[in-house]
Amino acid sequence: MTWGENRIDLFAVDEKGMAAHKYWDGSNWQPEGDKTENLGGDFVGEMAATSWGPGRLDIVGCTREGKYMHKYFNKDSWSKWEDFGGQFASPPSMVSWGPNRLDIFGIDVNGTLLHQYWNGESYLPEWENLGGPVSCFAAFDFRNVQG
């Protein structure tokens, strides 16, 4: 996942359930060595991450209680964790197809594929039901990047 040239961001859940972050700055991994940036939380499974532009990162993780939690980085600092709620049985997936747009997907405990999005001003009032039951899914975004 990247927000620009020569930048790679990695997110993981450590053995204590906290979100961990490490990034490539074009010449070195930061923080250096085996250290990571601790972003807190109490997660299980994989994190989802995306970027809608330079200096912007969004991550979502699933807590032990099955809630999705969201955090973003905007140029120089991380937000607090935002509770998206839910009773999810899958890790989240997230894509962004443009500035100020996030689409988050997950499977709830009933096997229903759910969708939530940010349109630059607000989220949907409730998770959108995309059908089911399903056991797995993949989300993909495409942006025509011209250089």
Give residue ranges: language-model regions.
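A structural motif
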Residues: 1-147
